[in-house]
């Protein structure tokens, strides 16, 4: 198997296959769940709005892939600084049956110099999650500066985040290799690689993209680190392109897709 094919297969099994469109329907979510099961293995998770968790759970169970995890989003995509609402949404997501919650960090508060709100929001959302995995979206494309991206990553980790995630996919600039490197370096420098994972989201579209991101993780945190409890790709169109690289399909995805 070529290096690119090996990377494509590895990336496929690390995907949070995502649909977070305002016009999502039960049918769209059922189709997403069916796509999570492929001839070469399953994606790690599907990522959907909370109201679709029951239909996703049913579909995954009926198709014989109950191990595909269900991720959902809270405080999304705005990243407001109302802790009470973020916690209430997170509790509701857990009650719906989410295995993982991706919450948006109050990044505008941090830009304005407020570090406390973000810490408290993440801490209380993690308490609401219990054993449910909490991924925190710091919105790198809005923070922009290395100092802010590293500070947000540190705050999330100190407050108990299980993963730090680049982006919502709803702003002009989402994951980039530069932002990924900054966040991975924080995980390394804080010596939390055993307990904290990383998720680039939005902008990872091809097998070559995924290969480059995984090579970076291997370089910074070691070859065995990026397993499905420490690394995820948040994407939708990536799956079609990975399957194309693996010669399972001849399709390629719309280059503008998430």
UniProtKB/Swiss-Prot annotation:
InterPro entries: Aldolase_TIM, DeoC, DeoC/FbaB/LacD_aldolase, DeoC_typeII
Biological processes per GO annotation: 2-deoxyribose 1-phosphate catabolic process; carbohydrate catabolic process; deoxyribonucleotide catabolic process
GO cellular-component term (any): cytoplasm
UniProt xrefs under SUPFAM superfamilies: Aldolase
EC numbers, comma separated: 4.1.2.4
Domain of life: Bacteria
CDD domains, sorted: DeoC
Key words, A-Z: Cytoplasm, Lyase, Schiff base
GO MF: deoxyribose-phosphate aldolase activity
Subcellular location field: Cytoplasm
Pathway entry: Carbohydrate degradation; 2-deoxy-D-ribose 1-phosphate degradation; D-glyceraldehyde 3-phosphate and acetaldehyde from 2-deoxy-alpha-D-ribose 1-phosphate: step 2/2
Top-rank EC class of the record's enzyme: lyase
Catalytic activity: 2-deoxy-D-ribose 5-phosphate = D-glyceraldehyde 3-phosphate + acetaldehyde
Active site (record annotation): 102 (proton donor/acceptor), 165 (schiff-base intermediate with acetaldehyde), 199 (proton donor/acceptor)
First-listed, main subcellular location of the protein, grouped into a coarse class: cytoplasm
Pfam families for this protein: DeoC (PF01791)
Stated role: Catalyzes a reversible aldol reaction between acetaldehyde and D-glyceraldehyde 3-phosphate to generate 2-deoxy-D-ribose 5-phosphate.
NCBIfam families, sorted: deoC
UniProt similarity note: Belongs to the DeoC/FbaB aldolase family. DeoC type 2 subfamily.
Protein known as: Deoxyribose-phosphate aldolase
The species this protein was found in: Aliivibrio fischeri (strain MJ11) (Vibrio fischeri)
